[in-house]
């Protein structure tokens, strides 16, 4: 059966602990979904950067994920510790993963990217409009081809801006 509230809280500590555990689980699913970790060796940086954003967008526009994003926003308003935890283990962690990829490309001489953290922030800005639309619940019908065109165009501009002088 479905355990009692008391036994669930015994396991997770309290409501906050349970919510944190759910967030951790959802984050793991998210990382699997966007397969962030694995940049396959022969894969070009361009196709990797496009793939991550495409998978990211596909993930966040699913209705169950939209509902979860809104729930997280609601909960973090009331709990600054949770907000920090989610930021450190969510957005910041994803950004750091991309920053590492960019730093390596810089070291290998493939890109001119002396500030990979700033560049990673810029990179995720490519989806900012979509994220806000999802949060606000406006204009949620997203044309997949237009989204792909947008991502490819922006990644190309991003890479152009990181070419060696």
Each model region followed by its residue ranges:
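Short loop-to-helix capping motifs
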Residues: 14, 78-80
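Membrane-interface starts of transmembrane alpha-helices
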Residues: 112, 116-120
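C-terminal peripheral helix-coil segments that are non-catalytic and often amphipathic
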Residues: 51, 55, 96, 100-107, ...
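Helix-turn-helix
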Residues: 1-17, 21
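Amphipathic alpha-helical packing segments from all-alpha helical-bundle domains
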Residues: 47, 58, 67, 71-73, ...
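Helical hydrophobic small-molecule/effector-binding pocket
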Residues: 47-74, 78, 124, 128-131, ...
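Amphipathic alpha-helical linker/stalk segments
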Residues: 20-52, 60, 64, 103
